[in-house]
């Protein structure tokens, strides 16, 4: 479950926050326009976050990865944005 403290890591200047609740967060990166759906099923372990990603609103989501916390997931999204904006290379 995402707490109100967890949700504070979502910077509204960096992300367009589409929806949030106790188990799900949907955001769009203002830098790349990519959409991210973050789900916390609390199973098999509390704190697990499954990260889904899509490039356009009309595209389907694909699983991008997992994180231990919402903050860790957001760091990964920002890292992905840097990679994307750098011509998809490090």
Predicted regions located by residue number:
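Negatively charged, low-complexity tracts enriched in Asp/Glu with abundant Ser/Thr
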Residues: 1-33, 58-59, 87
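Mixed-charge, Lys/Arg-enriched low-complexity segments
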Residues: 3-7, 52-90
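Hydrophobic beta-strand residues in large extracellular and virion-surface proteins
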Residues: 15-17, 25-27, 36-38, 49-52, ...
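Short aromatic-glycine-(Arg/Gly/Cys) micro-motifs in beta-strand/loop hairpins
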Residues: 32-62
């Amino acid at each position: 479950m995402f707490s109100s403290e967890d949700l504070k890591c979502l910077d509204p200047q960096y992300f367009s926050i589409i929806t949030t609740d106790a188990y799900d967060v949907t955001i769009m990166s203002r830098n790349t326009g990519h959409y991210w759906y973050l789900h916390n099923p609390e199973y098999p372990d509390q704190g697990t976050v499954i990260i889904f990603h899509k490039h356009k609103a009309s595209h389907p989501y694909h699983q991008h990865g997992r994180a231990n916390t919402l903050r860790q997931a957001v760091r990964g999204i920002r890292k992905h944005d840097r990679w994307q904006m750098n011509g998809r290379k490090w």
